[in-house]
Amino acid sequence: MTQVIVGENEGVESALRRFKREVSKAGIFNDLKRIRHHETPVEKYKRKQRLKNRTKRRR
């Protein structure tokens, strides 16, 4: 779970910006999109292949 602690002198806008950044880093929106709609076996295979290729490129 993503959590952002707001400092005393910190504005709400900057805290919200930090929260959005943390959520996007964690990949929460991508998981939600995948869970909300049915994923066919072909889509699941393609998603896993894309993820696999990304990890290969990083190495």
From Swiss-Prot:
InterPro entries: Ribosomal_bS21, Ribosomal_bS21_CS, Ribosomal_bS21_sf. It comes from the Bacteria. One of its GO terms (biological process) is translation. GO terms for cellular component: ribonucleoprotein complex; ribosome. Residues 45-59 have a biased composition (Basic residues). The keyword Ribosomal protein applies. Coiled coil: none annotated. GO terms for molecular function: structural constituent of ribosome. Keywords: Ribonucleoprotein, Ribosomal protein. Residues 39-59 are annotated as: Disordered. NCBIfam families: S21p. PANTHER family: MITOCHONDRIAL 28S RIBOSOMAL PROTEIN S21, SMALL RIBOSOMAL SUBUNIT PROTEIN BS21M. Belongs to the bacterial ribosomal protein bS21 family. This is Small ribosomal subunit protein bS21. The lineage of its organism: Bacteria, Bacillati, Cyanobacteriota, Cyanophyceae, Synechococcales.
